[in-house]
Regions:
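Internal/C-terminal transmembrane anchor helices
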Residues: 1-16
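Residues in intrinsically disordered, low-complexity segments of regulatory proteins
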Residues: 8, 36, 46, 99, ...
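Short secondary-structure boundary micro-motifs
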Residues: 13, 21, 43-46, 106-108, ...
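Alpha-helical transmembrane signal-anchor/signal-peptide segments
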Residues: 15-34
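Residues embedded in well-ordered secondary-structure elements
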Residues: 26, 49-51, 158
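Hydrophobic/aromatic-rich, well-ordered segments within soluble, folded domains that form packed cores
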Residues: 31-32, 38-39, 166, 170-172
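Short extracytoplasmic
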Residues: 32-63
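A cross-kingdom signal targeting lumenal/periplasmic-facing segments of multi-pass membrane
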Residues: 58, 62-186
């Protein structure tokens, strides 16, 4: 069976990479209001993450009292070369950006749907702004920031003829001084 799988795999992989999949017309619609957070007409920052080849993406700003956050969702209906969730061309900010500097990255554990999950935390700084960014990937109900686990989940989906769609979730809040108040906004 190993020889059979080894012989068939290149043809199957080529089929998967070239199969027609409807991606036209995909739209992400976020709610106008949720748990006291209300959609704002204008963003609080011009910063946006850089994700290549998404089939749908959106970025909206929400306010709740004096708290403000931005939500970015990037959706990949199917994974293909140059249109994949795990890709070195996807990043929060390019190196040597003319306005923004990455001043810190690390892992953080937060509660998502009542379960502790590890997310990526990034701190960005511009001359007059500072941003706290939390990001993670969603693949078949699994949240991860680990690119190896994500690639493993995608390979498993291909092997089992399952969907290989995925999304990146990025939430952002401004801060002054230390990012503690921004973290409270993002967690609520």
């Amino acid at each position: 069976i190993t020889i059979l799988v080894a012989a068939l795999w290149p043809a199957y992989a080529a089929y998967l990479d070239n199969r027609p999949i409807k991606t036209d017309g995909l739209v992400i619609k976020l709610p106008e209001s949720i748990q006291g957070w209300n959609l704002q007409a204008t963003p609080f920052t011009e910063w946006q993450p850089h994700y290549v080849g998404t089939h749908a993406q959106t970025m909206h700003t929400y306010r709740k009292g004096d708290q403000i956050v931005s939500v970015y969702l990037g959706y990949y209906r199917t994974q293909r070369q140059d249109a994949e969730l795990i890709n070195s061309q996807n990043y929060m900010i390019q190196q040597k950006h003319r306005v923004w500097n990455n001043v810190g990255e690390g892992q953080r554990t937060i509660s998502l749907h009542g379960k502790n999950e590890t997310i990526q935390q990034t701190l960005l700084r511009a001359p007059k702004n500072r941003l706290l960014i939390w990001s993670w990937n969603s693949l078949k109900g699994t949240y991860t920031t680990n690119p190896y686990l994500a690639k493993l989940l995608l390979a498993k989906a291909k092997l089992l003829w399952q969907r290989d769609d995925g999304a990146v979730i990025i939430i952002t809040a401004p801060y002054e001084g230390t990012p503690g108040s921004a973290a409270s906004s993002l967690q609520s």
